[in-house]
Amino acid sequence: MYLLGHIIGWLWLMLTVAIGLSRHSVKSANRFLILSRIGYLLIIITGVALAIRTLSGNWWLTLLKVILGLGTIGLIEVAFARKQESHLNSGLVTLLVCGTLLTIICGIGLHWQLTGNLI
C-alpha cells in the first residue's frame, strides 16, 4: 500500500514539475509549484513508512535512496525558484533529470534486492 502511494506520489511530482517548468508565465508555474508540494507530502509520508520497513533489509541502499530523494526535492525547489526569477538554465534541468533518474534506479534496485521482483 505504501509502495503504491509512493510511486503515485513520484508520478504526480514528475508530471507537475514537467508541466510547471515548461510554463512561460511565472503565475502559471507557481500553481504547479503548489501542486508539486502536495506530491512532496505524499512522498515523504510514504517514504518514511517504507524506509522504516526496509532499513533492516538493506540500510545503506535505503539511506542512499533517502538522500537522493531529498536532494531531488531540493533541486525541484531550486528549479522553481530560478523559474520565478527567469534564470532557469539547461544545466540545472539536466541535473534535476539525472537526480530523478538516479533516485528511481536506486528505488527499483532497493525493491529488487528486498523482494526479488523487478517491479
Swiss-Prot record:
The chain crosses the membrane at residues 1-21, 32-52, 60-80, 92-112. Its main location: membrane. The keyword Transmembrane applies. Keywords: Cell membrane, Membrane, Transmembrane, Transmembrane helix. The lineage of its organism: Bacteria, Bacillati, Bacillota, Bacilli, Lactobacillales. GO terms for cellular component: plasma membrane. It is a multi-pass membrane protein. It comes from the Bacteria. InterPro entries: UPF0344. The keyword Transmembrane helix applies. Belongs to the UPF0344 family. This is UPF0344 protein lp_1373. It is found in: Cell membrane. Pfam families: DUF1516. NCBIfam families: PRK13673.1-6.
